[in-house]
Amino acid sequence: MIRLFQLYEHQLKVRPKLTNSIMTGALFGIGDVSAQLLFPSGPDTLPPSAQTNDVKRGKYDIPRTVRAVVYGSMIFSFIGDRWYRFLTKVKFSNKPAKHWSNMVLRVCVDQLGFAPLGLPFYFGCMSLLEGHGLGAAREKIKLQWWDTLKTNWCVWPLFQMVNFSLVPLQHRLLAANVVAIFWNTFLSYTNSQIPVGGHKLTVQYPPTVQ
């Protein structure tokens, strides 16, 4: 494990964008695999528009995992990297960069800025990757956005305080993605128990796809 992390550190210095892309995609894929294996979707847990033949038969949904990897590696890895670099510049002008007040400010900017906007962006991307239009994205946002955001605020602010305080900049996206594996699995389970519009919808952020 130590040697693997050392290899990751070396590649991060030599090829930072490619390394972040591969690692983020892999962790998103792992999150989707764990969610599907622990809490498989069936016809009673998804709306009719999301029911494929494989889902109806209770089979593992490979395209869903592929979409998770594609979104993580080709979209979110670059957005997340730029966002964390931007957050390091967010600070009060009269306070040292490492002052506790700046850490609180960064968490507030992250949770009140990125989180509310990241959800509709994610649902829009997933709808396109699934072959649906923006109408499906609007439906997902209407059903899932507020409850998902409230749950997000119960989990991520505390982690981000630790992330911004103790984790080096180059590892913050990795740390967030590792925690997101457990976050997606937990959120998938809790929200699959809540009936929405006559169906049970699995809600995940960010970002395990369905």
Swiss-Prot record:
UniProt-annotated location(s): Mitochondrion inner membrane
Domain of life: Eukaryota
Keyword line: Membrane, Mitochondrion, Mitochondrion inner membrane, Transmembrane, Transmembrane helix
KW Iron (keyword) present: no
GO biological process: ethanol metabolic process
Pfam family, one: Mpv17_PMP22
Transmembrane segments: 22-39, 68-84, 112-129, 173-189
Membrane topology listed for this record: Multi-pass membrane protein
Gene Ontology CC terms, in alphabetical order: mitochondrial inner membrane
Record bears the keyword Secreted: no
Family annotation (PANTHER family): PEROXISOMAL MEMBRANE PROTEIN 2, PXMP2 MPV17, PROTEIN MPV17
The family this protein is said to belong to: Belongs to the peroxisomal membrane protein PXMP2/4 family.
Role according to the record: May be involved in cellular response to stress. Required to maintain mitochondrial DNA (mtDNA) integrity and stability.
Name the UniProt record assigns to this protein: Protein SYM1
Lineage summary: Eukaryota, Fungi, Dikarya, Ascomycota, Saccharomycotina
The encoding gene: SYM1
